[in-house]
Structures are given as C-alpha cells and as structure tokens.
C-alpha cells in the first residue's frame, strides 16, 4: 500500500504479485493510480502456488525438505484489467479477473 500511495498520480497502476493469491483490494487511489496488492497467479488452482499439495503439506508438518512437483489440472488465469485516460494516463477503472471459473 505504501508504494501505491507514494506513486499515486505519478503512474497509471501499481500491481503487486508475490503470494500468488489474488487480493480483493483493487481500487483507484485519490490522484488516479489503480492499485492491487496481489494480482494472483496463472496456473493450476488446486495446488500450493503451482506445486502439488502433498509434498508441501509434508514439509509444512515435518520441516523436512522434499522435491516439489509442478501441479497439473484445473488451470486458472488471474489478471487485472485497468482502464485509463489516454490523455492524462490516469486510471479510470480497475477490475480483478479469474478466468477458467
């Protein structure tokens, strides 16, 4: 949020990604910058950030390392749609999307 407020009015959008889980905090800031903390990921939805769940759960429970395998199936694509004014560069709308539902 701090970066969004700092850049408000200087950039069209501030979109983050790290946890791969889309946040429901999309908004237009006061000076015309669109903001969302985390857009989300594109990949297998029935997973832990794209990895098969079994090994991740085992590591979580035991603290022991293991080989992570990429998950397959139930693909989703997370995205954020930003509308902006071509003359000013300011955002006029923001909407989060999850395709494949």
Model-based region annotation:
Residues 56-101:
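A short C-terminal boundary segment appended to hydrolase-like catalytic domains
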Residues 1-70:
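Conserved beta-sheet core of the metallophosphoesterase superfamily
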């Amino acid at each position: 949020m701090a970066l969004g407020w700092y850049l408000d009015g200087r950039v069209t959008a501030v979109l983050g990604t790290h946890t791969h889980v889309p946040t429901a905090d999309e908004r237009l800031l006061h000076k015309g910058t669109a903001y969302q903390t985390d857009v989300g990921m594109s990949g297998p939805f029935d997973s832990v950030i794209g990895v098969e769940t079994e090994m991740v759960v085992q590591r979580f429970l035991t603290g022991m390392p293991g080989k992570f395998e990429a998950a397959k199936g139930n693909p989703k694509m997370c995205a954020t749609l930003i509308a902006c004014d071509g003359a000013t560069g300011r955002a006029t709308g923001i909407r989060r999307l999850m395709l494949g539902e």
